[in-house]
Amino acid sequence: IRDRIRAALIFASADTHNFLKNESKVTLATSVELIHTYSLIHDDLPAMDNDDFRRGKKSNHIVFGEADAILAGDALQALAYEIIADDNNLSDESKIRAIKLLSNACGKNGMVLGQHLDIKSESKDISQMEIEHIHSLKTGKLIECAVMLGQLENISSNEKIFKSFGRNIGLAFQII
């Protein structure tokens, strides 16, 4: 269930209204998976979580070195935005909205902040509420983003409902 759940949520969310072409669903799903993969590569680095293995395989920085791991993560992040910009099926307004949703989920209000708080909390006694906040930022924001990306061209009164749904799925994902 953990693999490609974000991509599946984009398709499921988009299929509620059928405004997005399949090619754009693939573009958006790919962009989210690129961001997710970049975050895992960076998360494993010695300066972060210092993990030598990811899903039973040697981490990127163990196989290729720290410098190349950082560059690989950076390249994946840039590619995520590039493929959205290159999608000719999306309007310019939708492209901007998609890039804003994605950058908010992975930037200073999302994964980056969550990673920062996680690093700062190491070797400290933190509350369950603080742990949940960190996880909601590190993982939940990108899941919420996936649901919202599926609704990219469906600006409606249901936006709050889909955002709440995405947030709740993100919280549930932490339990699994």
Residue ranges and their predicted role:
Residues 1-176:
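Mg2+-dependent prenyl diphosphate-binding active-site environment of isoprenoid biosynthetic enzymes
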